[in-house]
Amino acid sequence: LYSNAGVYNAVLIVTDTNGCQGYDTNVVIVDTLPIANFSFTDTICLGDTTFFSDLSVNTSGNINNWQWNFGDGNTSTDINPYHIYSNPGTYTVTLTVTDDNLCTHTDTQIVIIRPNPIASFTATTVCVGDTTELISTSISDSIYANIAGTINSWQWNFGDGNGYGDDLDIIQHAYTSDGPYLVTLIVTDQYGCDTEVSDSVYVLSLIHI
């Protein structure tokens, strides 16, 4: 077993029962191993595409095979693959590279796929001109609490063409005419993972006596 790469002269000496010897020499070339390495998208939310970039190097040959294992039962032989995970979680990703001397090396890294927040809200039914209160009841996904982010942004669209609400989880708005309005809320957590939800808010017409 050679501990270093290089060119070695191997000698085989054989001796028979009469003490006679013979020998043979051969040149043994020990190549350096390729060094597997890769990078990937920093923050990945469920549904995002994860891009992997091969950073492997080899000083004594050419890498000609890439074996990726994404840790969820899916694989690829592309140099720079991409993958979409079906579930949040922590995945062990491996890249094994092989060069034209059949030398191999493996790199292993952890990829975290974060869950998107669960978006929801409530609203009071009011009459025209009154103020309705919109309350975000959105939460982080408790099933994946160890990797889920904390919601820190709320984007409201009141559905009446009068712009967007302030970045608050509880907000008030007055509608100038009756009807159902489709209100949209987008919540975003500290990792940039977001979810959108829409629901109807009802504004009643005034009764004229």
Model regions and ranges:
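Surface-exposed, flexible coil segments in extracellular/virion-facing regions
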Residues: 1, 60-84, 147-173
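Short, exposed coil/turn segments at beta-strand boundaries within extracellular/luminal domains
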Residues: 17-23, 75, 101-106, 164-165, ...
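C-terminal edge beta-strand
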Residues: 24-29, 107-112, 197-203
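Short beta-strand segments of immunoglobulin-like
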Residues: 39-44, 121-127
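A short beta-strand segment in extracellular, disulfide-stabilized domains
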Residues: 48-58, 130-144
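Conserved small/polar residues in nucleotide/adenosyl-binding loops
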Residues: 207-209
